[in-house]
């Protein structure tokens, strides 16, 4: 499901139900009020939610005594996407004031097939686990800016041959299904009597994703970074027709527009790649005698997306999370946490989303 428009982690306010429209003014005043008055906007249609039925799965597990009682698992699932993609219909009449005749809506693709195999066990006191999964028809959303340009009948999108203008009222499915594989390997362990704590719990996991048959289609990359260079020619600062971020966007001044174009128009990075990988680390100390009937657990976790772009990894993205958890008699818990996003991901939508939180839980 989508975060609400205007909420902290929503990077595209046109996306959620009841939000929008997409402001499509090409120059001058690009405020919502002006776009509504001039018709230079694309309205949002109703969401197309998946059916309640049609989701099921099967898992088989076996203990392998010859491998120190390791557990082998085989599983299959058929499920519907929880992540929205966006379909649309191109404008039905020519002229800027008829941009409003286009439309878009969120969809949740159904019947995603998942095959998996897992193996977990203990090696020298350390719990280790691995998993290989394969989705032959995983839906991947096209780049949002490319989709919007198709809705406005631009002759320069990846969905038509170079120079070919989409037909009036042409529909577009905002995603394509691709074979997607993932392999992950991890381990957990505990060490007693560390830094005055009763125990130190450690966890590490690394994973790699592969998208087959990617071709020239462009998936992912935050819409805030504008359009990248297409096949019709490179960015020329003296030719506004080559700009991938139009003058007047978001009421930015010409200098800011020029800087955005210089940084993005010749840059085809940020879209999903064939391969991507990263890892996650976590450490937690448990103190059982600091406070009466209370376990105090400070912890730290670290994220690093090392290489490539995909549904789970964004190259160069890093994050650190710190937390302090108080658990009283397993009935009450209070946690203070802080999360910091940073790194060298040039297409991040997270680096300005650092946050602190307080959580109180009661079990009964």
What are these regions (language model features)?
Residues 39, 43-44, 48-149, 155:
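Beta-propeller domains
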Residues 64, 76-82, 123-125, 134-138, ...:
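Transmembrane beta-strands of outer-membrane beta-barrel pores
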């Amino acid at each position: 499901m989508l975060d609400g428009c205007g909420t902290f982690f929503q990077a595209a306010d046109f996306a959620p139900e009841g939000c929008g429209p997409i402001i499509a003014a090409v120059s001058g005043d690009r405020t919502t009020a002006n776009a509504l008055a001039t018709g230079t906007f694309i309205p949002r249609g109703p969401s197309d939610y998946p059916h309640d039925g049609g989701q099921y799965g099967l898992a088989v597990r076996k203990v392998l005594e010859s491998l120190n009682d390791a557990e082998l698992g085989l599983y299959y699932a058929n499920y519907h996407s929880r992540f929205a993609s966006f379909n649309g219909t191109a404008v039905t009449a020519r002229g800027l004031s008829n941009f409003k005749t286009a439309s878009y809506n969120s969809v949740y693709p159904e019947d995603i097939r998942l095959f998996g195999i897992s193996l977990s066990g203990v090696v020298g006191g350390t719990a280790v686990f691995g998993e290989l999964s394969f989705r032959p028809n995983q839906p991947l959303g096209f780049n949002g800016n490319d989709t919007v340009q198709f809705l406005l009948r631009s002759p320069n999108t990846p969905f038509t041959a170079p120079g070919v203008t989409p037909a009036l009222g042409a529909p577009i499915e905002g995603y394509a299904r691709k074979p997607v594989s993932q392999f992950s390997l991890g381990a957990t362990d505990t060490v007693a009597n560390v830094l005055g704590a009763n125990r130190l719990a450690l966890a590490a996991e690394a994973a790699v994703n592969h998208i087959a048959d990617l071709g020239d289609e462009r998936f992912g990359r935050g819409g805030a970074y504008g359009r990248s260079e297409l096949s019709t020619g490179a960015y020329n600062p003296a030719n506004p027709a080559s700009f991938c971020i139009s003058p007047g966007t978001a009421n930015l001044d010409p200098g800011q527009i020029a800087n955005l174009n210089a940084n993005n128009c010749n840059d085809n990075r940020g879209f999903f790649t064939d391969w991507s990988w990263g890892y996650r680390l976590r450490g937690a100390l448990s103190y059982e005698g600091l406070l009466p009937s209370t376990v105090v657990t400070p912890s730290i976790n670290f994220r690093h997306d090392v290489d490539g772009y995909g549904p789970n990894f964004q190259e160069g993205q890093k994050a650190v999370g710190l937390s302090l958890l108080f658990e009283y008699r397993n009935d009450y818990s209070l946690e203070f946490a802080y999360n910091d996003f940073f790194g060298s991901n040039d297409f991040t939508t997270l680096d300005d989303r650092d946050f602190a939180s307080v959580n109180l839980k009661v079990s009964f």
